[in-house]
Structure formats: structure tokens, C-alpha cells
């Protein structure tokens, strides 16, 4: 807008805030500060405000002055060399035992390697993350007519028709039992009958006539041998004449059949006993449970705390071509990172990243010869996490058991081997800590990284904002001057 206030004199109003300095894209300024996230103790090149936000997060009240200086320089077309100062920040981890992983080199040296998952950089932002590891997992979810007595994960079971597998999980509110089948090609239907684990529990016995000697008088507890089951414990009462008057069940065991004959050894029948006692299994419980309905586990299982099903990560993993060619099964695994709170993405339950069709085998390769091992790929490609420790809560894929642990090379396997299953393995990260208030020593240590002219090219040293006291501000300013003088460029 222009106005003429006197003859021949014109005033023009011009916005200079968006002026771009010619040649500014070749100018680089150095800045050290505290940030919401990002690597600590290393120089990071930044070319735009978008780049700054993606790498170091959004500004806070505590670092607003430094942030303004950075954004203004970038706004005029310049570039930045940024160092995040090391303050009392910590990385969030899968078990909540926070550690400080300064940068990728720090992690590669072993810092944080005991954790299954660690947030890529320090700060409370990592407390929003949930890491989901999922493989082929369970096969089906059975809705049972009643709750089985045994619902412990990894417990072997069969149907009355002989379909075998292991229990993965049980929801007592709905009587839904997730199961892993030994033969996934033969699915359970609602016409099958669930043969409850723990069948053959003894509740009553009879015993053969027995007369010993008076010194056997008393109560004697024994775990008899024989029969089709195990775990039975009985108590025999012998009177003053050495006669067995009763035998009662103390622990029913499992797997017994009515009519089984078991033996209480003489050694368990008191002083002077010379004969064994014969006991017959009289009553056992064999509760079979009707199956009301059946559905697929993978497509109907939700990630805890979200409405996302596992299908939001990717199709069900199975066995890679590499493993299959060696007779090995169930090596594939997906890894996904979920924003549980929305603090990272702006929307809760957002899938921040998904890395699919990885392998549990250390030497697995793609068709192009690249590594497929899940730890290698996650540590190389993920923007949000590192992984190194061991996943817990793994389950057997077959009733026979004996599946193999993650993290082995193919040479450790024989044809027919299977990997243990992670199924749905969730890790909510916690323990991350922010600290925006840096001391002169902390920010000065960060500025020292700009002193090497060979490692960092810069045209300016930006002081940023003032500190909490005049003396601290002066110390910060003097450090900027000292670094500039040392560089002499």
C-alpha cells in the first residue's frame, strides 16, 4: 500500500518478514538447545522448518526463544546444524526401566540393549508408543458353552474327534478360548466338542482288603504308581490291628480312567509294612464342553486399547520362502508402532509405522539377498524404536511342544522344526522423561561439537535465547564467541 503525504513524497508499506536472502540456501548456522525429541550429542543437518519439527519435535515454553531463532533463520532460506544438548532426559522402554540412549551410535554400543523395545530418542513422547509384534499366532477363537477348568496358556487340548492344539488365551467374560491348532488345515467347527484339559481327575477310589501289623497304625499319604494318569495322591488309614479302614483322595491328578489299578508301595504304609496296597480308580471327571461358535483369530483380534484389528498391520504372517526352502515353519513376523494417545500423530490409535514380513531367523534373506531378520530391519528402518532384548510370553505352536526360540540361524534347525509363536505380543513404552532446562555446562558441551571445522560446515553460531540468569546468559554468549573464534571461518 502506498500513500502520498506531501508533493513528491510517497510512503510504501512492505512486509519484509518473507524476504528471501539471495544465496541464503548456502548459508548454514549452528544452534544448540534442548528439544522434545531427536538425537543427543551429534550434529544433525536441518534444511527446513518441517525437517526441524520432524526431527526434534514441536517447541515448548521452555525452549521457545531458541526455537524462534531457529525457525526465523530457516524461514529466510538458511540451513541449520543442530545439536540437542544432553539434559536429564530419558528414553521410554518396554518394561518402564528408562535409559538414556543418546543416538544411534550409543545404541549400537550396547546402551539399552537389555530392553525388548526402546523409543528411538529420549523424552516423554515415547510414552505414547505401543509396539505390536504379531506372527501367525492363534488359529481360531472358540466360544464355549461353559468355562473349562483349565485355561492356562500353552496347555495342550484335544477335541473329542481328535483335533489337537494348545490354549493361547481365555476371556472369562465371554467364554472365548483362542487356540493354536496342531494342524491348521483341519479347523475346528461348532459341531466339534471340546475335550477339556484336565479330564480324568480322580474323585473316589476303592481298595483291596489289606491286613498288615499293628506298628502301621496311623494315617499314611502316598502318590501311587500305575494307571493312565499322573498326579494322584491318596491317604490310607490303618487301625491298631494293621487293617486298612479307608483310602481317600487328597489330589485327583489328571488323565486317569475309571477302573485303573494303582499301587501304594509298602514303603509308604508305615513301620513294619511288607505288602503293597492295591487301589482301584472309582470315579473320574470327564467334562466335555459344547462349542457354540467359531471365528478366525487373526481378523477378529483387536490391539488392546484400540479398535484396530491385527489386519490393520497387514495380512497374517506365516512362513517365509527362505525358511520354507529349509523345512522350517512360522518364522514370519510383523512389527508395528501405535500412537496410543495421539500425542505423536494427533490422533489416538494411529499406526505410525508397520514393518511387515520380517523373520525370526538371523540369516533369513529376501529374494534380493537382503537381511530379513526382524531386529536388523527394525533397527535400520524404524523412525520410532530400537529392538534388541528378548520377547516374552511366547507360546508353542503344537501340542507336542519343543518349538525353537527366536534369533537362531537356519543351520541350527532340522527339517520339520517350527518357531515359537509371539501371537499378539504388545509392549507399551513408559519411563520417558523430558528436561528442557539446560545448564551452561550442558549447552556449552553441545556447542563444542561445532568446533571441528572438518566435521561441520557453518557460517554462523546462533546463541538462541537467554537463560535464567544474567551470569548463565553471559556464559552461553561467551561460548558462542569462543567457538566462532576457534573455527576462524
Regions found by a protein language model. Name each.
Residues 122, 254, 269, 342, ...:
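Short, glycine-/Ser/Thr-/acidic-enriched flexible segments
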Residues 201, 243, 329, 455-457:
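Short loop/turn motifs at secondary-structure junctions
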Amino acid at each position: 500500500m502506498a500513500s502520498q503525504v506531501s508533493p513528491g513524497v510517497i510512503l510504501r508499506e512492505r512486509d519484509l518478514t518473507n524476504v528471501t536472502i539471495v544465496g541464503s540456501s548456502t548459508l548454514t548456522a549452528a544452534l544448540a538447545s534442548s528439544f522434545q525429541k531427536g538425537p543427543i550429542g551429534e550434529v544433525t543437518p536441518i534444511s527446513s522448518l518441517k525437517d526441524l519439527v520432524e526431527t526434534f519435535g514441536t517447541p515448548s515454553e521452555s525452549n521457545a526463544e531458541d526455537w524462534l531463532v531457529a525457525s526465523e533463520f530457516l524461514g529466510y532460506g538458511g540451513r541449520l546444524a543442530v545439536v540437542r544438548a544432553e539434559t536429564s532426559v530419558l528414553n521410554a522402554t518396554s518394561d518402564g526401566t528408562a535409559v538414556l540412549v543418546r543416538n544411534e551410535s550409543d545404541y549400537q554400543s550396547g546402551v539399552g540393549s537389555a530392553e525388548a523395545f526402546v523409543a528411538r530418542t529420549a523424552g516423554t513422547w515415547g510414552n505414547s508408543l505401543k509396539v505390536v509384534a504379531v506372527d501367525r499366532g492363534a488359529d481360531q477363537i472358540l466360544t464355549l458353552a461353559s468355562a473349562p477348568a483349565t485355561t492356562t496358556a500353552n496347555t495342550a487340548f484335544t477335541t473329542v474327534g481328535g483335533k489337537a492344539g494348545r490354549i493361547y488365551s481365555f476371556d472369562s467374560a465371554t467364554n472365548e478360548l483362542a487356540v493354536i491348532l496342531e494342524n491348521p488345515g483341519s479347523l475346528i467347527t461348532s459341531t466339534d466338542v471340546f475335550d477339556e484339559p484336565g479330564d480324568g481327575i480322580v474323585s473316589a477310589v476303592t481298595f483291596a482288603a489289606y491286613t498288615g501289623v499293628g506298628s502301621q497304625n496311623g494315617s499314611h499319604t502316598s502318590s501311587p504308581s500305575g494307571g493312565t494318569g499322573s498326579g494322584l495322591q491318596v491317604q490310607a488309614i490303618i487301625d491298631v490291628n494293621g487293617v486298612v479302614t479307608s483310602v481317600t483322595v487328597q489330589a485327583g491328578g489328571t488323565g486317569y480312567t475309571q477302573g485303573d489299578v494303582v499301587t501304594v508301595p509298602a514303603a509308604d504304609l508305615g513301620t513294619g509294612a511288607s505288602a503293597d496296597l492295591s487301589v482301584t480308580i472309582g470315579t473320574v471327571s470327564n467334562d466335555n464342553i459344547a462349542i457354540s461358535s467359531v471365528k478366525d483369530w487373526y481378523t477378529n483380534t483387536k490391539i488392546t486399547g484400540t479398535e484396530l484389528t491385527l489386519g490393520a498391520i497387514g495380512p497374517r504372517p506365516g512362513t517365509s520362502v527362505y525358511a520354507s526352502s529349509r523345512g522350517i515353519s512360522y518364522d514370519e513376523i510383523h512389527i508395528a508402532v501405535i500412537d496410543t494417545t495421539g500425542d505423536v500423530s494427533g490422533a489416538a490409535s494411529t499406526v505410525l509405522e508397520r514393518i511387515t514380513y520380517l523373520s525370526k531367523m538371523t540369516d533369513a534373506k529376501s529374494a534380493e539377498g537382503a537381511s530379513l531378520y526382524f531386529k536388523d530391519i527394525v533397527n535400520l528402518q524404524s523412525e520410532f524404536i530400537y529392538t534388541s532384548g528378548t520377547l516374552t510370553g511366547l507360546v508353542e505352536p503344537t501340542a507336542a511342544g519343543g518349538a525353537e526360540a527366536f534369533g537362531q540361524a537356519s543351520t541350527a534347525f532340522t527339517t520339520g522344526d517350527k518357531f515359537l509363536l509371539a501371537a499378539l505380543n504388545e509392549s507399551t513404552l513408559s519411563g520417558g522423561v523430558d528436561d528442557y532446562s539446560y545448564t551452561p555446562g550442558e549447552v556449552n558441551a553441545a556447542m563444542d561439537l561445532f568446533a571441528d571445522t572438518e566435521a561441520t560446515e557453518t557460517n554462523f553460531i546462533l546463541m538462541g535465547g537467554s537463560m535464567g540468569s544474567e551470569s548463565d546468559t553471559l556464559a552461553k554468549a561467551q561460548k558462542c564467541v569462543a567457538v566462532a573464534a576457534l573455527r576462524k571461518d
